[in-house]
A protein has these predicted regions:
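Phosphodiester-processing cores and adjacent nucleic acid-binding clamps
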Residues: 1-234
Length: 234
């Protein structure tokens, strides 16, 4: 008897509400999820929850479980201490206050309320001349009911590893592990690009060192859900 395939769930979908990034209307996303028999979908639009209500309503109406999340630019307050070209470039970029993007998901009503608080803080906390971001200290105040993924190649741990700052990567992973405990997952992404391959083994080692789970993610910004599913299944 053939072994039944495990259900597949995309956790890193970006809709058209990911401004200047996503191109997938939520109504279309719901129809695709039904057509491809996905039991659930995770939405992680960048720095906002603009589509959370529409996403929840439309997916529930189609019998698909909505997983509400957000990708947040997070300032750990440590990136300017490092002197690699990656960090110096980051310090001079529009994302100067971002040490990388974390993906946070609401696991209950408290988590959703905290996501709302963080979404609001993204726009009210920075100075007028600063890009949209939040500080890790703010997340520490609002971590209840949230599950965290470390963000793939644009996450704070991977960015430190890209700059050969292994101690910085470990310190960030340690901080997140202390904050989220068993709700932290080190995210591995495989889009077939070198910067993912270079750090994958180090990410796996960090997950083991800090007793974090491991999650597979693919950043979906358009309609190619099925194509990416096949890539994972090999």
């Amino acid at each position: 008897m053939a072994e039944q395939a495990q259900p597949f769930v995309h956790l890193r979908v970006h809709s058209a509400y990911s401004l200047l990034e996503g191109a997938l209307p939520i109504g279309k996303l719901a129809k695709l999820a039904v057509g491809y028999n996905f039991p659930a979908i995770g939405l992680t639009d960048t720095n906002n929850l603009f589509g959370a209500l529409e996403f929840s309503e439309k997916l529930w109406s189609e019998g698909v479980q909505p997983i509400v999340g957000c990708s947040l630019d997070v300032d750990f307050g440590d990136q300017r201490d490092a002197q690699s070209p990656m960090v110096r470039t980051l310090a001079n970029s529009p994302r100067a206050h971002s040490a990388g993007r974390l993906a946070l998901y609401a696991m209950n009503a408290d988590g959703y309320a905290n996501l709302m608080r963080l979404s609001k803080a993204m726009y009210f906390d920075p100075a007028a001349d600063e890009p949209t971001h939040t500080k890790i200290a703010r997340i520490e105040e609002c971590s209840g009911g949230l599950i965290a993924l470390t963000g793939g190649p644009d996450g704070p741990i991977s960015l430190a590893l890209h700059g050969d700052h292994t101690a910085l990567a470990a310190a960030r992973c340690d901080r997140l592990a202390n904050l989220f405990g068993d709700r932290l997952y080190v995210e591995l992404q495989r889009h077939g690009i070198d910067k993912e391959r270079r750090v994958e083994s180090a990410l796996i080692d960090l997950a083991g060192k800090f007793s974090a789970g491991i999650a597979a993610g693919l950043r979906i910004i358009d309609h190619q859900l099925r194509h990416q599913k096949r890539q994972i299944e090999g």
